[in-house]
């Protein structure tokens, strides 16, 4: 019988927790909107499509209508001839690329009369929102 060969045990490096920069920046944006534009804060909402989910949960949500590519933030306030504003939010540091499904969705929304844009970070999104809010209200013909 051969003697057992003992291999040295290597200590595993502790894994660093992933940092959700996009989520943090978007939360900061929502805080600023709440402070500066309370009426807008009441209307704007986040579409929780992203994130990693268990396969069964993702399948269930897909059957309930979750679609890939829908922008992160929706503001259903009509301005400047647009019916509303959609923002695909990306972090300023290590931003994820705009996916083909996001590009296609943004194009479809723009074709339907919405202002759908990609914003890189909290400050970019705030500037775009300010510019949108300065546009005259879209009047609906009765």
What annotation goes with each model-predicted range?
Residues 1-142:
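Catalytic phosphate/metal-binding cores of nucleic-acid and nucleotide-processing enzymes, i.e., regions
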């Amino acid at each position: 019988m051969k003697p057992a060969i003992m291999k040295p045990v290597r200590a595993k490096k502790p894994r660093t927790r992933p940092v959700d920069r996009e989520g943090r920046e978007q939360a900061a944006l929502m805080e600023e909107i709440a402070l500066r534009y309370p009426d807008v804060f009441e209307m704007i909402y986040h579409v929780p499509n992203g994130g990693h989910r268990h396969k069964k949960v993702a399948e269930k949500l897909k059957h309930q209508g979750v679609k890939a590519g829908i922008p992160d933030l929706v503001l259903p306030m009509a301005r400047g001839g647009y019916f509303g504003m959609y923002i695909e939010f990306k972090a300023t540091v290590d931003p994820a690329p705009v996916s083909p499904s996001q590009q296609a969705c943004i194009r479809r929304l723009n074709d339907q009369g919405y202002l759908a844009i990609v914003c890189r970070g909290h400050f970019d999104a705030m500037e775009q929102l300010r510019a949108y809010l300065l546009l005259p209200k879209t009047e609906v013909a009765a």
